[in-house]
């Protein structure tokens, strides 16, 4: 289990990932991550988690498991992985190794944690990013 100021993340016995948002702007981060994951699924991006359940009342999502953490990766390869994501119209704004996993089933590096990502074109030609309201 991962327990931080922004979220708790646990992997169930069935392998599914349960993420519950908390802390500053939790609702906005939850809604934005859901929006980004749905956007990527619509575009056929297969190296990100797929949403299985969305529980707005608990600020919780359940996703597929994208593999285990990566402890070492060449900087060039890390840049390539995040650049590949941009081909699907999303820029990851936290391009750290902690947001890359390795899925043994197909030998694929995957990207996780999209609460601060930017959708490069929201359909109007403008980018869409997390914009927390000051009222929360």
Give the role of each language-model region.
Residues 1-38:
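ATP-binding glycine-rich loop module of kinase domains
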Residues 95-102:
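Hydrophobic residue at the +6 position relative to the catalytic HRD Asp in the kinase catalytic loop
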Residues 84:
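Acyl-donor (CoA/ACP) binding surface of acyl/acetyltransferases
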Residues 75, 87-90, 103-136:
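C-lobe/activation-segment region of protein kinase-like
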Residues 22, 26-30, 38-81:
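Conserved structural core of kinase catalytic domains
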């Amino acid at each position: 289990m991962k327990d931080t100021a922004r979220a708790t993340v646990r992997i169930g016995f069935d392998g599914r990932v349960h993420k519950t948002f908390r802390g500053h702007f939790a609702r906005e981060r939850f809604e934005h991550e859901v929006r980004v994951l749905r956007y990527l699924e619509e575009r056929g991006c297969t190296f990100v988690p797929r949403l299985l359940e969305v529980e707005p009342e608990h600020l919780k999502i359940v996703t597929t498991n994208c593999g285990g953490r990566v402890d070492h990766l060449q900087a060039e390869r890390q840049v390539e992985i995040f650049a590949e994501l941009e081909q699907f119209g999303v820029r990851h704004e936290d391009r750290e190794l902690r947001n890359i996993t390795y899925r043994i089933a197909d030998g694929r590096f995957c990207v996780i944690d999209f609460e601060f990502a930017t959708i490069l074109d929201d359909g109007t030609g403008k980018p869409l990013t997390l914009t927390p309201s000051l009222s929360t």
